[in-house]
Amino acid sequence: MKNILCYGDSNTWGYIPGGKGRYEYAVRWTGAAQRLLGDGYRIIEEGLNGRTTVFDSPFDGSVLNGKSHLMCCLMSHAPLDAVVIMLGTNDLMHSHTAWEASRGCITLSRMVMNGALHFNAHTPRLLLVSPIHIGHEIAETDQSPLSVSGYEESLKFA
């Protein structure tokens, strides 16, 4: 069995926009990946609403900082064959740029590639996924913590 850790934010968690709860597992992208890959693979979903790459929240401190929790996730789910990281959108909510978010992803990537050997027989493969583009209409709603300037910055992701 191949183990794949998916480390991300609300898009990995399955957040339904507008605060309407969580998508069923089969609807989330991790569930779709599990279905497509089949029984020889186990998708490990590590999504957290509001998670950033490496930045503390001015309101919640390090609770949502992806760097603070990645190593524990790598260790608790070992051995891993692959790690998928999809983070960066929430960095923009705290006035960081797409470039800074990409640097944060590089830091996380190095943690996977360098730290995994401590508890894995081999270094897992790494897939770094660009955050999804946020719709302009979402940035303009009162419920969105992403400003219009954050929306424009998000377009700089691949």
Model-found features: residue ranges?
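Short acidic/His/Gly/Ser-rich catalytic and metal-binding motifs that mark active-site loops
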Residues: 14, 52-55, 135-140
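Charged, often glycine-rich, active-site loop that binds/positions anionic groups
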Residues: 51-70
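Short, flexible/disordered intra-domain loops and linkers
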Residues: 16-25, 57-61, 141-146
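Serine-esterase "nucleophile elbow" of acetyl-processing enzymes
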Residues: 1-48, 54, 73
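N-terminal start-of-chain detector that recognizes signal peptides
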Residues: 15-17, 53-58, 98-102
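A general secondary-structure junction signal
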Residues: 47-50, 128-130
